[in-house]
Amino acid sequence: DKVGAQTIAQADDLKIIVRAGAGYDNIDLEAATKAGVVVMNTPGQNANAVAELAIGLMIYMARNQFNPSTGVEIAGKTLGIQGFGNVGSLVAAKALALGMKVRAFDPVKSDEDMLVRGVEPTSSVKTLYADCDYISLNLPLVTVTERSVGYDLLSAMPKGGVLINTARKEIVDES
């Protein structure tokens, strides 16, 4: 649910808004600031649930939406992780346990942080998309990530490649 300016204005004694999970995109930060309301979030609080969802969606797609006569295993497939933070690192651990090869791109995380977890770092996001059967999108919604995944990256994926977006919908440019 969104916490907009009208809701904030009507809550005379409101002092703090705490959002479960990462991000603030469902809260009108300008209205909260004007009203003197502190806004907080709980990054990482639901990271495991989101990572499990990403893995579940990969299995669902690999099994052709659980059509009993078709589908493939994910073991041996390559997973690319865009964004190696709380969720991305958990997705990597779960994918490795299922026998997947895992690569990642994150301009903030060090290669060593990925390597120590058994993940191969990639030098560019385009390389990640071109080399992976599945991409797990785990980015915050900020100015630089909004609409950052579009035709150029998606068309670089191998035939049959699957994008799993458990981040914010606004990161994918659907135009």
Model region roles, listed by residue range:
Residues 14, 75-79, 151, 160:
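Phosphate-coordination loops involved in phosphoryl transfer and adenosine-cofactor binding
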Residues 106:
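Conserved acidic E/D residue at the C-terminus of a beta-strand in Rossmann-like folds
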Residues 5, 26, 84, 89-90, ...:
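Residues forming the Rossmann-fold NAD(P)(H) cofactor-binding site
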